């Protein structure tokens, strides 16, 4: 039994150029959708799973929403139904998938008996030409609903409560499974220990997570996840995978191949073996260019002489450059953008300095330097020496003396170091004091509204 596993389509407008009123990044996404359909028409899978986040934005204008729903149906969902025995469409997160959009899809596809749309947790048996298969569907939900029952809860505890709820839900659904029939879980959540597209690892408390032990305890043969945009095999005994997004969505996806999984369930003694293969898609690549001070100097001297060649062609580019302070002043960033565009860059997202070298340390002022020292350093930095420097110092001397006669020297300069504060807190109307004497590092904790911030604000005021 072959199972096509995709998700995180994010159909909609993305940051990028437009042509004839059409967002070209949206067309990139549609191109990836069509590529999946073409592969599916060749493979003819028994089950195709769309594991959530079919759309990119939940809240959009009516005309945009209708265009997204129409393209999702005409160019993706309906064609998949035409070449798959069964198609599973899972609701993702509330900020991407709109419940009303899914209601519209349900009404528009009432005649498609092989399309199964899940907006609530469920277990369902589907019949394919290779035999029956059970689908355990665990769509995303809005954890903000829990705030009605636990007002004032902090984010970490909210995540832990939602985590407990989701894992208990999965274990409850597992009791409905018939273990004589292959079972596939599809869910749109973070799995504990999974790797995000930026390389960080999700742990319990940071998000609503499904535990690998819960996946194993569910007793399914395969778990097909959406939500994390980096394709990966998860750390559970049960074969479990993130399909990843179909296209690169931002620079966190740079260098990561995107596509979809094709899983094959093969009956064997004591269960089902799973063989999985990853199929790439024609994604739009992101590329970060880092320019050295030498390259920046070349742009300053002769912008026309700089070329990036095929490196940037058809890619979304961001530029990070390092240079001196003088080069930063002389650099025209538009010259960099022109060079990238001339070499075929699809879109230049940003051009920003990564490191601008300031004056040498010997030229830096300190809190011990007075006006005369500052003037001397300025003259030295600007190569003003000899008689001209002496003349400027002589002209400046009476002005500096008049501005600073030394009477308040040292009284209003230096670091602000609090020793002790005594205030009447306007939030709680209580007397409060705090001694900083023995403190090197401190954290002010407490529930919202007790006056943590005002303790210090009142003291400053």
Stretches with model-predicted labels:
Residues 19-127, 212-220, 228:
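Core catalytic region of metal-dependent phosphoesterases/phosphodiesterases
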Residues 191-269:
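Conserved beta-sheet core of the metallophosphoesterase superfamily
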Residues 10-15, 56-59, 88-102, 142-146, ...:
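Active-site environment of divalent metal-dependent phosphoester hydrolases
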Residues 265-416:
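Accessory, non-catalytic peripheral segments of nucleic-acid enzymes
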Residues 438-461:
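Phosphate-binding glycine-rich loops of NTP-binding sites
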Residues 408-430:
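N-terminal pre-Walker A segment at the start of P-loop NTPase domains
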Residues 100-208, 243:
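Conserved catalytic scaffold of divalent metal-dependent phosphoesterases
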Residues 1-4, 11, 16, 123-137, ...:
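Beta-strand-turn-beta hairpins that frame and shape the catalytic cleft
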